[in-house]
Design a protein with these regions (language model features):
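Bacterial N-terminal signal peptides
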Residues: 9-18
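Hydrophobic small-molecule pocket/channel-lining residues, especially in calycin-type beta-barrels
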Residues: 21-153
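Positively charged n-region of N-terminal signal peptides that target proteins for export
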Residues: 1-10
């Protein structure tokens, strides 16, 4: 009985890992500043990590704010279009991701129930590049648009 339980647990772990690695969004993504176009005053997310967290996905974002101070935020949820809490970001308290196809996500960030940022995340066909196109309103109420490129690590 113990052998069967252990075997089942290992099989589930390997299945979860296979599903996770099959998703091109998963992994560590590093900012390619030379290929990116930032709106003035918008924080720069230098490293973004997508990883499995049980049946959910955990996204960890490390970067710099407009003053050059280190930032760190985390989101854990599903790519189902529903809002899940964000921790560590003063400009958003909820974020949702919706899977459009195997390489594309739609993202919406909210603060106090109000949409502050929305955009699209597309992984290249070769899986080596990720382009994030977003628009929204910054903390000062100014509209912005950015196109940010990341390279898979």
């Amino acid at each position: 009985m113990k052998t069967n339980t252990t075997g089942l647990a290992l099989a589930l772990c390997f299945f979860g890992a296979a599903v996770c690695f099959a998703d091109p969004q998963m992994g560590t993504w590093k900012l390619n500043e030379a290929k990116s176009k930032f709106a003035a005053g918008v924080p720069k997310n230098e490293m973004v990590v997508y990883e499995a967290a049980g049946e959910n996905v955990k996204i960890t974002v490390d970067g710099k704010d407009k003053d050059g101070n280190a930032t760190h935020n985390e989101w854990t949820g599903k790519f189902d279009g529903k809002d899940y809490p964000v921790t560590g970001d003063p400009n958003q308290d909820a974020r949702s991701y919706k899977k459009v196809n195997d390489r594309t996500l739609e993202m919406t960030a909210k603060k106090d129930g109000k949409v502050t940022v929305s955009g699209r995340i597309v992984v290249s066909a070769d899986g080596k590049t990720r382009t994030v196109t977003v628009g929204g309103t910054d903390a000062d109420g100014k509209k912005f648009q950015s196109k940010v490129v990341y390279d898979k690590q």
